[in-house]
Amino acid sequence: MNVKRITIIVIFLLAFLTGVNFVIFPALGTAFTDPSLFALSSSQFGNLFIPQVICIIISCLAAPFLVNKWGPKIILTFGVLLMLISTGSLWILHYFIEAKSSLFSLLMIMVAFTGTGFGLSITTLNPLAASLFEKENSSAILILQFLVGLGTSTSPLLMNLIGDVKNWMYVPGSIFIAVSAVLMAFLFLKIEKGTFFNLPAHFKISDKLWIFFIAIILYGCIEGTFGSFGGIILKNKGLDNNAANLGLSLFWGGVALNRLLFGILSKRWNLSSFFLVSPLCVGILLFILLVYPNINILLLMMFLIGFFMGSIFPGSIGWGTIEFPAYSVLVSGFLMAANQIGTGTVTNILGHFSNHISFILGILILLMLVISALFFYLKRGSKIKDAF
């Protein structure tokens, strides 16, 4: 097996484990709110993720400049180490579970470490994956994002595997060991900084990149709505709890399947037209969900909404990388931050509109139409066919 192939395997495995590590705190929600363990209130558990969102945004915006100065290997290693410190500390915390007065403050610090580490890691991983496939940048980013998403969906399953919530410490323990092993392998790789990660000495952010930024903030609002509010929407439309949870799983399954297929098939066919019409398709599906919420097709609708949303975010990073090759790492950080801004904003305001589902769906339709209009505007004179 040649060196490049080993590098690709390690990078993509690290992306998967970064996704697993990232959702460890929400995955342990039952342990955190268990009165016999961490005994956090519902509001404390919700507030736990505020520093995470803030730290992700800051680190995503800072990462391009840090990578430009010290190179991708150092920054990615630092990001993974921050997440490992958080996960390892959480693992050790089971020895001090009786000190309940300090637990919330300690968890806030750990979550901040996880957010900072994730922002640095994922912002660096996107262009690093793209640099390994110079003629297939977008495909590489789509597949990498598929693996990150697969990781985020795997971590909650670990709680089901361990059974009793009192065995929660085995989740951070197993993740810590797995990530440490892959990080050790990564440290032995030779990762060149290369021109792919260099920023010009003087630059101005293009107006087109600002448009990408706005589009992804809006996308983040929609993704965040389904991520934190999808179950409530489905129950409002007539599904019971089990069916609503299944619908949410199908939504994320659709997202993951699209990213995998898009990453594979775009190597053979030009999928730029599919990418451009995807926001319109989501808008149409949301409109049907609003005016004709047939309980028999709701689960299919959730899968299709997720499927057509799947390529929008990573595809935008890939497209932006092709449009602005001199700013590839900046594109990654800029759009990762935009996604978190949208997701974080909508997550914190949706609770005030829980009784206005039709209004929420109407806003989502409008946002998708705006995203579609922005993409068609960006298409003019662009290199989108080279991206997909």
Describe the role of every protein-language-model region.
Residues F25-P26, D207-L257:
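Extracytoplasmic gate region of multi-pass secondary transporters
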Residues S59-P72, G163, R259-N270, S354:
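Helix-to-loop junctions at the C-terminal end of transmembrane segments
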Residues L81-K100, C281-P293:
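C-terminal ends and interior cores of transmembrane alpha-helices
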Residues S101-L120, I297-S311:
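Hydrophobic core of transmembrane alpha-helices in multi-pass small-molecule transporters
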Residues M110-F146:
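Cytoplasmic helix-loop-helix junction between adjacent transmembrane helices
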Residues K135-E136, I143-I191:
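Helix-loop-helix hairpin linking two adjacent transmembrane segments in secondary transporters
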Residues W269-S316:
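C-terminal transmembrane helical hairpin of 12-TM major facilitator-type secondary transporters
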Residues F324-I357:
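A late C-terminal transmembrane helix in Major Facilitator Superfamily
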